[in-house]
Swiss-Prot record:
Annotated function: Catalyzes the transfer of a methyl group from 5-methyltetrahydrofolate to homocysteine resulting in methionine formation.
Residues involved in Zn(2+) binding: 660, 662, 684, 745
Family: Belongs to the vitamin-B12 independent methionine synthase family.
GO MF term list: 5-methyltetrahydropteroyltriglutamate-homocysteine S-methyltransferase activity; zinc ion binding
Biological-process GO terms, alphabetical: methionine biosynthetic process; methylation
Pathways per UniProt: Amino-acid biosynthesis; L-methionine biosynthesis via de novo pathway; L-methionine from L-homocysteine (MetE route): step 1/1
Organism of this sequence: Mesorhizobium japonicum (strain LMG 29417 / CECT 9101 / MAFF 303099)
Amino-acid positions noted as binding L-homocysteine in the UniProt annotation, renumbered to this chain: 450-452, 503, 618
E.C. number: 2.1.1.14
Residue positions of the active site: 713 (proton donor)
NCBIfam families listed in its UniProt record: met_syn_B12ind, PRK05222.1
Name listed for the protein in its UniProt record: 5-methyltetrahydropteroyltriglutamate--homocysteine methyltransferase
Top-level lineage group: Bacteria
């Protein structure tokens, strides 16, 4: 029985606090590394004690496992001035986060700063397949060289060995690594670098064997996406080489996030000792894989959902796998989750506030591990050995299926009555645009922000005190109004054209709304990693969704009362609420999304009635829900766009609908972006030098666009000239009348010391370009 990978963050988010302490200069690297070592040891011991037989190592990362691989193979971009040897810690973090020029800015001094990439922008970051986890995108050139530059996989194996725990090291596969990479050279496919990369992997496998490893897990999730023939050939080539590098070291190729599809033959013909398949996302492939795979192959069955929080129906799973198990040597069947459990919270036992019935329907990483053990014991010892556990599992599934917390006839009836007219604006964009232009009278290149401002320690402290009952609502409201007023006055002072209230009342852009909607449940400690030290607590959609009362009206009214400038109403869109939640698995996602869209539609209507003339409906996560296979895209995009429009179209032509998207590559879904028909879309483009705008120009995208002109995920403060250059790049691609100027995402996670100069520079850059355009 294997776990493939487990959460890295620590039960009390120890990794987050250690990282942020190091980055702020409050603690040395030694403290960070000691915390990381303690987290690894605790994780290994817990898995061992729960009965896991194949415990992973090297699944831990200080920031991101793809970035770890970049460091491991020496693929550090030239701008970070690393040459050889082990990649230093500050170079590692500079690749992830960027950094300022001054050593004092990160609190470290001396040789920790020598030639370690300070003052440089971070590498690009994007979604890990179709999850809400982010990875750092490798940057590879056609003359790229590789060298083993980090012994982390070996070090972690030996670390566990010293504790008396034998582990199975986990590596990101070489083909997936290259498939995820990008190159500055147009037309160059990084897959061509495979012959240069493989010697690094071969050396690493030899070192792992010498250290005492008998198995290694190599993750190749690229096998569930569309591959071209040369990429399939690359997989065969790679594993023919790797299987011979250390012949006594057995390789388990782990494939997850979906069906093998037309890559099935490639996968089962790889010359490896084991193959892991995802039977949660693709249960239909069980029979085919079992029929075609060689019987000397160790078959790892991904039976427990590694991406969602629902308790499994264990008797049903055993019934389903009975035919394959009956025809396969039992010592060659491995029970596992569908994928690494990186994507779920750590332990349900920490949750003391959940209703008992709801809690009985759930399973986090610890409970999923126990479920795996039960399944493994049922196969090895017979069902009678775990009869009590199987009965409890079946009872929980039956209770959930009939619960009144799950089913609301009023919601189901409203969804059934949705009409096509409810998903269309009254007039076309050109009509709306003229009316909105006359209404607002904004200058060219209008400036705004995405919505949130820094959540300072004082803001978090006040929210926590209110949640604990230590701060009355009257006092909490007064505190928030003071924060909102200060933010509005400061925005006016620096000359922003369209303002926001700052979202100080919001803990999270999804959770804030979910807490006010019926059909959701919430955790106290259900944190999962989004990227680096950014952890989120996704709400859980347990039943039919509906809005009970207005959710944002009070705060918007107050902010707008302070200024004659327009203040945007700020909402999270239905697709993002869906994709950033743990979604019920008893309904199609499209049906759940329509329920959420109707709730947001009600809020949009109330905002407009109250006088809001600009309403932003963020769909930051629209693309991440895109299926991994292109053949499945259109069906998803059809209902996702329908849900956005259902949420946004109950307004008059003079009301301007904004939306925001981040972290995404949109070139392949530009039709859907246009079909959303938002009046203004703001997008994340700063890390990729506005590449997306080329696609929008080719498409002749008609509506207004705010390309992000500085990267908020980095602590760097961009100079006026840097921002001006990006605006000029945008002008070469789109008409001046289409362009807005804004950061590429919300500013919640940044410090005011970073935000203030950055936004001042952004406004100055917009004014300079405005003047240049007027005198041209």
């Amino acid at each position: 029985m294997a776990t493939l990978g487990v959460p890295r963050i620590g039960r009390r988010r120890e990794l987050k606090f250690a990282l942020e302490s190091y980055w702020s200069g409050k603690s040395p690297a030694a403290d960070l590394l000691a915390t990381a070592k303690a987290l690894r040891a605790a994780s290994w011991r817990e898995q061992h004690d729960r009965g896991v037989s194949k415990i992973p190592s090297n699944d831990f990362s200080l920031y991101d496992h793809v970035l770890d691989t970049v460091a491991m193979v020496g693929a550090v971009p030239a701008r970070y001035t690393w040459t050889d040897g082990e990649v230093p810690l500050d170079t590692y973090f500079a690749m992830a986060r960027g950094n300022q020029d001054q050593a004092a800015d990160c609190g470290h001094a001396g040789d920790e700063h020598a030639a370690n990439g300070h003052g440089l922008a971070a590498m690009e970051m994007t979604k890990w397949f179709d999850t809400n986890y982010h990875y750092i995108v490798p940057e590879l050139t056609d003359d790229q060289s590789f060298a083993l530059s980090s012994a982390k996989p070996v070090d972690h194996f030996l670390e566990a060995k010293a504790l008396g725990i034998h582990t199975r090291p986990v590596l990101l596969g070489p083909v997936t690594f290259l498939k995820l990479a990008k190159s500055p050279e147009e037309g160059f496919n990084p897959i061509a670098l495979l012959p240069r990369l493989l010697p690094v992997y071969e050396e690493l496998l030899r070192r792992l064997k010498l250290a005492g490893a008998d198995w290694v897990q190599i993750d190749e999730p690229a096998l569930v996406v569309d591959l071209v023939p040369n990429e399939r050939d690359a997989l065969q080539f790679a594993y023919c080489r790797l299987s011979k590098a250390a012949p006594e070291l057995k390789i388990m190729v782990a494939i997850y996030f979906g069906s093998l599809g037309d890559n099935l033959e490639t996968a089962i013909s790889l010359p490896v000792a084991g193959l892991h398949v995802d039977l949660v996302r693709a249960p239909e492939q069980l029979e085919t894989v079992g029929r075609l795979a060689q019987k000397d192959l160790v078959l790892s069955l991904g039976l427990i959902d590694g991406r969602n929080v629902w308790r499994a129906n264990l008797p049903a799973i055993l019934d389903r796998i009975k035919p394959i198990v009956a025809g396969w040597p039992l010592d060659r069947v491995e029970i596992a989750p569908s994928c690494s459990m990186l994507h779920v919270p750590i332990d349900l036992d920490m949750e003391t506030a959940l209703d008992a019935d709801v809690k009985s329907w759930l399973a986090f990483a610890a409970q999923k591990t126990d479920e795996l053990v039960v399944l493994a014991r049922a196969l090895a010892e017979g069902r009678d050995a775990v009869a009590a556990e199987l009965e409890a599992s079946a009872e929980a599934a039956a209770a959930r299926a009939t619960s009144a917390k799950v089913h609301d006839p009023l919601v189901e009836g409203r969804v059934a009555s949705i009409k096509v007219a409810m998903t269309r604006r009254k007039s076309a964009f050109d009509v709306r645009s003229k009316l909105q232009g006359d209404t607002f009278g904004l200058p060219s290149f209008p400036t705004t922000t995405i919505g949130s401002f820094p959540q300072t320690a004082e803001v978090r402290k006040a929210r926590a005190a209110h949640a604990k009952g230590e701060l009355s609502y009257v006092d909490y409201e007064a505190f928030l109004k003071k924060e909102i007023e200060a933010a509005v006055r400061w925005q006016e002072e620096i000359g922003l054209d369209v303002l926001v209230h700052g979202e100080f009342e919001r803990n999270d852009m999804v959770q804030y709304f979910a807490e006010q909607l019926r059909g959701f449940a919430f955790t106290q400690h259900g944190w999962v990693q989004s990227y680096g030290s950014r952890f989120v607590r996704p709400p859980i959609i347990i039943g039919d969704v509906s809005r009970q009362n207005p959710m944002t009206l009070h705060w918007w009214r107050y902010a707008q009362s302070l200024t004659p400038k327009p203040v945007k109403g700020m909402l999270t869109g239905p697709v993002t609420i869906l994709n950033w939640s743990f979604v019920r698995d008893d309904l199609p996602r499209s049906a759940v999304c329509r329920q959420v869209a109707l709730a947001i539609r009600d809020e949009v209507s109330d905002l407009e009635k109250a006088g809001a003339k600009m309403i932003q409906i963020d769909e930051a996560a629209l693309r991440e829900g895109l299926p991994l296979r292109e053949a499945d895209w259109q069906a998803y995009l059809d209902w996702a766009v329908e849900c956005f429009r259902l949420a946004s179209t109950a307004v008059g032509d003079a009301t301007q609908i904004h939306t925001h998207m981040c972290y995404s590559e949109f070139g392949d879904i530009v039709d859907a972006i246009a079909a959303m028909d938002a009046d203004v879309i703001s997008i994340e483009t700063s890390r990729s030098q506005l590449e997306l705008l080329d696609t929008l120009r080719t498409f002749k995208y008609p509506n207004e666009i705010g390309p992000g002109v500085y990267d908020i995920h980095s602590p760097r403060v961009p100079e006026v000239g840097e921002i001006s250059n990006l605006i000029m790049l945008a002008r070469k691609r789109l008409s001046d009348g289409q362009l807005w100027v804004n950061p590429d995402c919300g500013l919640k996670t940044r410090r005011w010391e970073e935000v203030r100069p950055a936004l001042v520079n952004m406004v100055a850059a917009a004014r300079a370009i405005r003047q240049k355009a007027q005198t041209a």
